[in-house]
Amino acid sequence: MLATEAAIDKLGARGISISEAEQMIWNRYVVIRNRRGSAARPQRNIRRLPIGRSDSGRFLTLVIEVTVEPTTWLLITGWESTPAERMILMKA
């Protein structure tokens, strides 16, 4: 996962370290499509929201962008998962 300085700053403002965000990928997670935005905005097609847990058990939701390299994601931002997002993970 790649993260820009802006993404690291956004995570930090929410009390999430980049290492905590990366831990989520090695634990159980689900990926949902980004439903925000209009059909005219490309974000809707290239952004995904992985929902999972860090090693400490904290539920996180990240916003990632698909890159030209299929095994590499660009981290945009993230937050502590909402109750609805946690439910998506638990039901998966």
Task: Set out the residue ranges of the language-model regions.
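Ribonuclease/tRNase effector modules and their secretory precursors
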Residues: 1-92
